[in-house]
């Protein structure tokens, strides 16, 4: 039995590593598609339609017996889940990616659990005790993570790996960056494209955090996880299709080249349908704290893949800010894990406490069937006669 549980846990760990690698590949592939010139709204529409066509039938078959009936409260919750987690999350991410690069886009993503904790604290679904080490670790980790995000916005630094700023002026990525190589110039000369991209990425993380904060209480009342995802994609796709209908005037925007078609298929099948399925399955086995610990792998995977396939430079600011974000994330997730572990231990105390022992062992003749001990803990001496 233990070996089976251990095998399932190892499979979940491998699955989470795959999820982060798939997300890193998504950042690189979509950056290539955006450089070609695909419309962001059109890209999101095709991606969501593909994901919805996969998730809807799977949710109908898999959650057929566990899916509760729909009501107005659930529909309203799915509406906001689609608005934040699908529509706002995806669109802001693509706009931010178009103005920055895959390394920065992936480096900000690990802040999602921290933003989720802040929103959950405001909503009352998360508790905070500053007199305990876990509570102090949560606050300290949040501050460190925010400081890392601010550092990435205000400081770029030297190109430690890859081409320098002068050497990369001919590439598509540099067309979206400041020629001075520093972000502070954008605050004096107006908001630059790179600064706008970073703000969109922060908005992307905020939308995803709101999605997770709203989803947590919904899943308690609507335990069909895959159906929740499918309904969220339904409303998000409706938002995306409606926006694309009014904001894209030329029919040529809906035509895809070969590379764009490959990016759309990858985004819909791998980055959406498969990743959401693996996240849900791994969350049931490992729990949310351990699953969140794998998010810091995303910047490393994206930086490595973008350096190989795009030749994107890796700057000092991204390394320092990314390290701060990862450190803050680990602090928050460690504190959450310790709190849940302590709560689980407190739940076992009434069963294993000494006060309960006399009720079990006082009369060994009336002990329950299937007790762990086959003999009485206090054996009577046998007569020598």
Swiss-Prot record:
Bilayer topology term: Multi-pass membrane protein
Any one of the GO CC terms: membrane
InterPro entries recorded: EamA_dom, WAT1-related
Molecular function as annotated in GO: transmembrane transporter activity
Domain EamA: 23-153, 216-333
Pfam (any one): EamA
Alphabetical keyword list: Membrane, Repeat, Transmembrane, Transmembrane helix
Localization (cell): Membrane
Transmembrane segments: 14-34, 41-61, 75-95, 104-124, 141-161, 194-214, 226-246, 261-281, 285-305, 308-328
Family: Belongs to the drug/metabolite transporter (DMT) superfamily. Plant drug/metabolite exporter (P-DME) (TC 2.A.7.4) family.
Full protein name: WAT1-related protein At3g45870
